[in-house]
C-alpha cells in the first residue's frame, strides 16, 4: 500500500478552500444573462465554448490532491443539482462557495463546526419554506416561454420553442434535443411512446457516439414471457431477414442462448436486431404491452390469448417509423397503429382514471395516457459552426429542465431576488447557542451571493444593487441585469422555477456543511520521480 499524506484542521481546510475557490471562480463567471463564456480545451477538435456551469465544473481537475478534493466535492454540488433540477448548477456553486468561505472564517475564530452546521441546516429549512410559500403556479404558455428564455441565457427563440413543444405534447410528453443538420433551429413533434427500459446488451448499439440503438422502420415482436432460446421464433426471424427490415424484441427478458444468438447475428450483420425488457410489472406490464401493441398495430404474443410463439407471423408484429433505444429508455416514434384503436384505448384509460380511488394507480394510468396521447417533440438545434451548436444545445438542455421544474413546483422572481427576499424567514429563528446563531448568519450572508455575482458579471457593483433592493419590501421587486432596470420581475419576465432555486440552496448547504465539518484529509503521497543515471562519459562522444 502506498504511503499516505494526512492534513489536519486549519491546514486541511485551507487547502480544501483553495480548491473550492478555483472551481467556483471558473464556474460563477457564467451566472446570469450577462454571464461570460468559458473556453474548454479539447484533446481533439475545436475548443468548446460554454456558459453551462456543470460542463465547466466537470472539466476541472487540480494537481494538488488536497485542493482537488475540495474542488471535486464542490463539483458534486453542481452535478447533484443538475441531476435533480437540471438547472441552477452555477447558483448552487456560488452558494456553496459563500457558505464554505464564511464557515471557514467562523471555525478559525473558534466556533464549533457541528453547531455551525446545525445553524446552517436550520436556516436552509426556513428559507426553503419561505420560497415555497411565495411560489406562483405557472398557468400560461407565455410564462413557460419566459422560464425557458431566462434559463437559456436570455435566448427568446429557445424559450418560444420550448413553450410550443410543451403545448403540443403536454407536460407529460417527451421532449428531446438533437443537433440540426442546418443552421436553423426547428421543432418537430412526432407521435410516439417512451418507456424506461434500455437495450439488454451494448452490442446492439448502432450509434457508438451517443451509445444509442437506432432502428429505422423496424418490425416489433411483443412477447409477455421470457425468451430463453430462439427455436420457437425461427420462422418469424427468417421472414424478418427476408424483408430486410430491423427487428425489435420486447419481452419479459431475453436471456442465455437467445440473447447470445441475437448478438452474434447483429455483429455478423445478418439481422439488424435489438432486444429490450418489457416495461412495468405484473398486470401493469400486460396493460403496457397492450398499449405498445395498439400503438404499433401489432399483437401481444400471450398464452392467455392462446397465441404461441411458433405460430407468430409477420402480420402479428408491430411496426414503427423509428425506434431509439438508450441505456435506460426506449422511444417508439410514429407507430403504425390505427388512429381509431389508439383513441379507443386512450378513452378507456381516461375512464379508468375517473374510476380509480388509489393515487398510485391514478398516477400510473396518467403516465400511460401521456405515453399514448402525448407524443415526442424533437428540438433540432442549429448554428453556423459545430462549436456554436454544442454551446446552444447545452443551453436548450438547461432550459428544458427548468421549464419542466417550473410546471412541477411553480415559479419565483428570478435574478437571485427570491433568495434575497427569503432572508426575512431567518429573523425569528430560535437557536440553542451562539454558534448555531452564527450558522444562521452565514446563510443570511451567503444567499446574497447570487445577486452580487449576477451584478458583477453584468459589470455593475454588487453591493450597490443589493443596497437598492433592500430599500423595497415587495417580494417580486428586483433588478433586471439584462436591461439594467428595477421593477416587478414577474412583469419583466425574469423568473426562476422554485425547484431550481430550492435544490440549488439545499445541495449547496449539504456539501458545504460536509466541507465545514472536515477535520482531516488523507491523500496518496506524490511519487518522486528518480532521475536516471547518466551513462559513462556523461553522454559525450570521445
UniProtKB/Swiss-Prot annotation:
Subcellular location: Cytoplasm
Keywords on record: ATP-binding, Chaperone, Cytoplasm, Isomerase, Nucleotide-binding
Family, as annotated: Belongs to the chaperonin (HSP60) family.
A GO BP entry: protein refolding
InterPro entries associated with the record: Chaperonin_Cpn60_CS, Cpn60/GroEL, Cpn60/GroEL/TCP-1, GroEL-like_apical_dom_sf, GROEL-like_equatorial_sf, TCP-1-like_intermed_sf
PANTHER family named in the record: 60 KDA HEAT SHOCK PROTEIN, MITOCHONDRIAL
Record's function text: Together with its co-chaperonin GroES, plays an essential role in assisting protein folding. The GroEL-GroES system forms a nano-cage that allows encapsulation of the non-native substrate proteins and provides a physical environment optimized to promote and accelerate protein folding.
Subunit relationships: Forms a cylinder of 14 subunits composed of two heptameric rings stacked back-to-back. Interacts with the co-chaperonin GroES.
Reactions mediated catalytically: ATP + H2O + a folded polypeptide = ADP + phosphate + an unfolded polypeptide
Top EC group: isomerase
Record-listed E.C. numbers: 5.6.1.7
Domain of life: Bacteria
Gene: groEL3
Predominant cellular place of this UniProt entry's protein: cytoplasm
Organism this protein belongs to: Sinorhizobium medicae (strain WSM419)
Protein name in UniProt: Chaperonin GroEL 3
GO molecular function annotation: ATP binding; ATP-dependent protein folding chaperone; isomerase activity; unfolded protein binding
GO cellular component: cytoplasm
